Amino acid sequence: MSRFVITTTMALGLALSAGGSAQAADTKQLFDFYCAQCHGTAGDGKGINVTKDFATDPRNFTNAADMEKRSDDDIRSVIKDGGPSISKSPLMPPWGATLSAAEVDELLAYIRKLCKCKAK
């Protein structure tokens, strides 16, 4: 009986700890699919779709000094409503009809991890 309890407890613990990393992996997949094409897989603004013809460079999420100036509300708004929603580039598309509110919040948290910064 105690062997069963120990095995069950260990399995439950592993499952719960894997859930957090699964969510992190899912968020990375979201970022890679929707954001990395322009912002780069490292978030440095050097995505594979960026050309010299871009009117402006995509935001470098790893630049902590710049990203600290951006409020969470502004970043959330840009993800949902596109660049023009905060007077930024129209090349940044709106994802509000595609992503859930929870996914937008997950991407926001992921972006904050990339810059290792806090909102203003």
Description of each model-found segment:
Residues D57-N60, A65, D74, V78-D105, ...:
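Axial heme c-ligation environment in periplasmic c-type cytochrome domains
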Residues A24, E68-R70, A101:
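Short, solvent-exposed loop/helix junctions and linker helices
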Residues A15-L30:
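Electrostatic cytochrome c docking/interface patches
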Residues K28-Q29, F33, D73, S77, ...:
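Solvent-exposed, polar/charged alpha-helical surfaces in well-ordered, non-transmembrane soluble domains
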Residues M1-V5:
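Positively charged n-region of N-terminal signal peptides that target proteins for export
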